[in-house]
Each structure stands twice: as C-alpha cells, then as structure tokens.
UniProtKB/Swiss-Prot annotation:
Compositional bias of kind Basic and acidic residues: 48-78, 153-171
Organism whose genome encodes this protein: Homo sapiens
Region (Disordered): 1-183
The keyword Disulfide bond appears for this protein: no
Organism classification: Eukaryota, Metazoa, Chordata, Craniata, Vertebrata
Modified residues (Phosphoserine): 15, 17, 63, 87, 127, 147
Residues modified to N6-acetyllysine: 174, 179
Covalent link Glycyl lysine isopeptide (Lys-Gly) (interchain with G-Cter in SUMO2), residues: 13, 62, 75
Name of one Pfam family that matches: SMAP
Family from the record: Belongs to the SMAP family.
Name of the molecule in the record: Small acidic protein
Keywords attached to this entry: Acetylation, Isopeptide bond, Phosphoprotein, Ubl conjugation
Compositionally biased residues, Acidic residues: 106-149
Amino acid sequence: MSAARESHPHGVKRSASPDDDLGSSNWEAADLGNEERKQKFLRLMGAGKKEHTGRLVIGDHKSTSHFRTGEEDKKINEELESQYQQSMDSKLSGRYRRHCGLGFSEVEDHDGEGDVAGDDDDDDDDSPDPESPDDSESDSESEKEESAEELQAAEHPDEVEDPKNKKDAKSNYKMMFVKSSGS
C-alpha cells in the first residue's frame, strides 16, 4: 500500500486530461441529429425556451388592451380602500367573531348596532375577569329560558305555576329556535 501512496501523493491535484472536455458532462456537443431534435432535447433539459405556438398571445388582443384612465384608477382605488377599511373595522370590533349558533340573531340596540360582549351596562356582577365566549353563550341560554318563563308568567298571572306548564313553556321556547324561519 505504501507504494500506491507514493505514486499518487495526497493533496496534489491532477492535471485535467484532454478527454474530459468531450466527456459526458459536455452535452452541448452531443450529436442529436437535426435542429428540431436538438431543440427538443434542450427544452426537456430545461435549457431551451419553447416558442409560443398558440393563436392568442396574452396582451395582444384588442379586448384586453384597454387601459384605464386616471379617473377610473382613482375610483377603483377609493373603492378598494373603503372595502379594506370596512373589513378592518369589522375585524377589529370583534362583533362577527362570536359563534352564536343556528337561528340566533342579536338583539338590535336603539342606535342599530347589535349587542357586543362586554358592553352590557346593566350587569350587576362585579367580577374583574371577563367571561370566556363559551361561558357567555351558556349563560345567555339560561337567561333566555328564565326570560321565557317570566314572559309566560306575565301573560298568565292567574295560573298557578305548574311544573308541566313550565316544561311546556321551555319546550315551546326551544322550538322557536329549531323551526326554520322560511316557512
């Protein structure tokens, strides 16, 4: 083995042989036949550009070569900015983020905006931490059931509270949300 090391010393570069220039790495010099086959080979190798053979070149058609005027540009930009601003306002307000479930519609305030979580001024609890959305939904359902019972009692003050009537009122109230609004 020491004889092999002496004939090829470590760290000495070999000179390039003249047959490396025509080796397998030089595919440009390969004889591929006619020009069409050469172009196909280059295209398949990713080196050649395919010529456009379609009838319609993008941007050359008369209907697509319409340029906008300055007024149209301004109008389009204003519309886009207003749409962007509206979407950012609704996203930041968080009004549409809450999942309310099927058949639920928020009660409209006197100024036309829906009730947003955290804006209730008539709450009497002084809890410092805000409720999670799941807690507020379950609380709102129990509040709805209680308000339905109160409405039932207000409509029929002379009736004695019967557990059966109470159960019927709850089921009727729940059925209002189950039934489709489009009858």
